[in-house]
């Protein structure tokens, strides 16, 4: 069987009709997926049909961006209807492993072995997954190009457990986009080499070779009509705006130093009593004042931060913490809800731009992208939520953040991973493919205006005099200049100049009259002042009161009143904090064992043998 598979691989390389001389653009599904999105996914075909070698078996949609193994949901996932009578995973497609002649699920003798156990899914365990899974290899076909021996983890059954202990079914698998190695090798005596879709196309792609072992991606937004973009061996430059962060990766993860999170307004008035508020990351937790290392991970859905940080963000929003889900639900009846979501309001994430820590880069995420929807089976009716999940697990910026950001990596030659601002729904989305060079990797941003890609979506609020900036790092992004004057302004200047000239003339005339009067009356009072001086007697108000009425008025004339100003209250509205939760403990990677809390019984972990997998 092994020899046949290798012969089949060589044969298929010769029968390819499509030629790719540059980066390979992936195809995105026309559907969107939940139950906490909507999210976008790419289409691939897994396995090969035994009756017709050229017809793969199962088309599935996968969330792209993982590293090392791809996680594929099997059709047997729908056998368990205890969680839900509806198999939501069927919408994205399931892999029927029984019909694939190229599947190998026995050669790799390493965990997971096909028994029930905790399963790593991304880089946070805030919503742990318990599954019956095992290692395997099989073919994956992308746009007519078959890729053999792809590293997989097949999931026969499983669920995810939310903070209330309720279990919910899995719905969409993940597509690995490589690792720091071209292959993942298993075994000591007999070595088994597995591959990844982009490493194979780079190393053995033949006529479909891509220029580098890399990718560039912007997952976009299904709800706002921002199409997804994924290129293997390159990137779409129109999805990269402005400066680009370049960081070292750690194994298959993308760590970066997050310095602060602030709230801002791109233009117009603010839904708050201020236009900018910073230091929200460390609010309530001074240990975060110097920043926090987070991991950017497209396979996890939410923004996972310490509890104090999520609470600080929530305190500025009309949201309520829901402990059953570990998420914040929007109060859609609050007038602030529509103001915030439709105006140019955003969260700004300030990062270290590079490993030298001598520059920053800011990624802005409009609140319109942070108005996501929970659907069945998580909730009975669609519910809007704010995707910050408090966690003591590894802090992660997942798909909710990456709707507004470009992410990419060049795996080889001491490569780097990249982060940049991505455009909004008013961008042209005309693909401008750029190559990631093999030995001199870099990503260049476009000169497009980020604000312009959102103007059609936003309705700026009227500006008020009570708005101010708040925080020590208040941004000046909202300052504007206008060199042109309207007709009304010009007329106002002319009228003002005329009035001002008349006022100056009146002052001069008044001064002359007063001066003449003073000269006339000075002689009549000369003797009196002389007498007072000779007697060396101090004058007082009583003596001066004997002067003439006109002279007394001149000597005691009051200056014109000055215009007075009152400073009103600039304090904004206050919001009740979410219910108090447990304090944040030291972050770590330790995972707790998770017992079943759902309305069904788990199979005994020791009761499932390897033979039952097949």
Where would I find each of the regions flagged by the language model?
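Conserved beta-strand elements of beta-rich interaction domains across eukaryotes
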Residues: 68-69, 180-182, 222, 235-239, ...
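Short hydrophobic beta-strand that contains or immediately precedes a catalytic carboxylate
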Residues: 57-65, 72-73, 294-298, 304, ...
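Extracytoplasmic, non-cytosolic globular domains
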Residues: 237-238, 248, 290-335
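Fungal secretory targeting signals
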Residues: 1-34, 61-64, 71-72, 510, ...
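C-terminal membrane-anchoring module of eukaryotic surface/secreted proteins
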Residues: 445-605, 612-613
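Aspartic protease catalytic domain
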Residues: 344-489, 496, 500, 514
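Aspartyl protease catalytic domain
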Residues: 21-36, 146-286
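Signature of the N-terminal lobe/flap region of pepsin-like aspartyl proteases
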Residues: 34-163
